[in-house]
Amino acid sequence: MADGKAGEEKPEKSQRAGAAGGPEEEAEKPVKTKTVSSSNGGESSSRSAEKRSAEEEAVDLPTKPTKISKFGFAIGSQTTKKASAISIKLGSSKPKETVPTLAPKTLSVAAAFNEDEDSEPEEMPPEAKMRMKNIGRDTPTSAGPNSFNKGKHGFSDNQKLWERNIKSHLGNVHDQDN
């Protein structure tokens, strides 16, 4: 039984050290593993049942909810302090900024829509003028969705165009034979 008491004291000392060390150390300490051998089914021959039950009880004493609550309270207190500091700073700066920003915005909007200053008409660049002309297949507009059947000569039916070419060639060949 003296060995059992010594085994019980060691986990308690490690628990006290973990509590003094902080929440990070507490999370690492309570994990305990047993050596497993295949010959005796996971039980160590040198350890008695009393020693194992005493150590398991000592490990079960610290509960996880207490650790989580300590950690949760630490985070909660930090966030409330930061939120109050931020709200005070924004509250004091809001009235000063709103008054000056309204006056220049109204002046800039009025100046933007003032038509008296723009007496000369806007000039179009030559590239834009060229794009607006619809000259054959090579214009950018021929690639649009409404330009499906467009060729070099504008909108035309390719089948009809092929028939016309055949007729003209037949007419040329017939004229050459005569």
UniProtKB/Swiss-Prot annotation:
<feature type="modified residue" description="Phosphothreonine">
    <location>
        <position position="139"/>
    </location>
</feature>
<protein>
    <recommendedName>
        <fullName>PEST proteolytic signal-containing nuclear protein</fullName>
    </recommendedName>
</protein>
<keyword id="KW-0007">Acetylation</keyword>
<dbReference type="Pfam" id="PF15473">
    <property type="entry name" value="PCNP"/>
</dbReference>
<dbReference type="GO" id="GO:0016604">
    <property type="term" value="C:nuclear body"/>
</dbReference>
<comment type="subunit">
    <text>Interacts with UHRF2/NIRF.</text>
</comment>
<feature type="modified residue" description="Phosphoserine">
    <location>
        <position position="53"/>
    </location>
</feature>
<feature type="compositionally biased region" description="Low complexity">
    <location>
        <begin position="37"/>
        <end position="47"/>
    </location>
</feature>
<keyword id="KW-0131">Cell cycle</keyword>
<keyword id="KW-0597">Phosphoprotein</keyword>
<feature type="modified residue" description="N-acetylalanine">
    <location>
        <position position="2"/>
    </location>
</feature>
<feature type="modified residue" description="Phosphoserine">
    <location>
        <position position="119"/>
    </location>
</feature>
<dbReference type="GO" id="GO:0043161">
    <property type="term" value="P:proteasome-mediated ubiquitin-dependent protein catabolic process"/>
</dbReference>
<feature type="modified residue" description="N6-acetyllysine">
    <location>
        <position position="64"/>
    </location>
</feature>
<keyword id="KW-0539">Nucleus</keyword>
<keyword id="KW-0832">Ubl conjugation</keyword>
<dbReference type="InterPro" id="IPR029169">
    <property type="entry name" value="PCNP"/>
</dbReference>
<feature type="compositionally biased region" description="Basic and acidic residues">
    <location>
        <begin position="1"/>
        <end position="15"/>
    </location>
</feature>
<feature type="modified residue" description="N6-acetyllysine">
    <location>
        <position position="152"/>
    </location>
</feature>
<feature type="compositionally biased region" description="Polar residues">
    <location>
        <begin position="139"/>
        <end position="149"/>
    </location>
</feature>
<feature type="modified residue" description="Phosphoserine">
    <location>
        <position position="147"/>
    </location>
</feature>
<feature type="region of interest" description="Disordered">
    <location>
        <begin position="134"/>
        <end position="178"/>
    </location>
</feature>
<feature type="compositionally biased region" description="Basic and acidic residues">
    <location>
        <begin position="160"/>
        <end position="178"/>
    </location>
</feature>
<feature type="modified residue" description="N6-acetyllysine">
    <location>
        <position position="150"/>
    </location>
</feature>
<feature type="modified residue" description="Phosphoserine">
    <location>
        <position position="77"/>
    </location>
</feature>
<feature type="region of interest" description="Disordered">
    <location>
        <begin position="1"/>
        <end position="84"/>
    </location>
</feature>
<dbReference type="GO" id="GO:0016567">
    <property type="term" value="P:protein ubiquitination"/>
</dbReference>
<comment type="function">
    <text>May be involved in cell cycle regulation.</text>
</comment>
<feature type="modified residue" description="Phosphoserine">
    <location>
        <position position="87"/>
    </location>
</feature>
